[in-house]
Amino acid sequence: FIVQWVLLAVLAIVVVALARQIGVLQLRLAPLGALEVDDEGPPLGEAPEARSASTRDGSTVVVGGPGPGRLLAFVSGSCPICEQVLPSLPAAAGASRLELQVVSDPELETAYRIPGVPFVVVFDRLGVVRSKGTVNSLEQVEGLVDSARRRAAEAEEVRAG
């Protein structure tokens, strides 16, 4: 009878230790922010000239230039991660009052130095690139939008002050 109680106590200690390890692993594997690399994508703080680009459905949109703030997403039809990210893009753009543009245009990817897809670029109302990065989750897209909003506000303060 005493042996059973000892085994039960040992089992309880093992369960608590495993639960702690699972928590540590979850913290280590938490989603990371979007990867912003300086030499990938259009330069931050610059306004690339407006260009025509093909969307996924074959229509043409104008990318860049002054206008409403924009969330530009580069995707490919053969990209499974793109298919996972696409449904969350309208919500991320709409929550920040950004116009969503989803393009699949190899020429624009080359001109903008896009390293791979899915890649997101956030423009302010002046057409200036405020954030950019490779994404694979809604959290990363939201992080880029937040960074863009913060950088645009800082730029406004500099212009005003």
What is each PLM-predicted segment?
Residues 91, 95-108:
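Thiol-based oxidoreductase modules, predominantly thioredoxin-like and allied folds used
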Residues 67-69, 84, 153-161:
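Non-catalytic interaction/Regulatory regions outside core domains
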Residues 1-40:
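Long, leucine- and charge-enriched amphipathic alpha-helices
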Residues 57, 89-92, 120:
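Catalytic cores of nucleotide-enabled group-transfer and carboxylate-activating enzymes in metabolic
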Residues 60-89, 141:
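Short active-site neighborhood of thiol/selenol oxidoreductases, capturing the structured segment around
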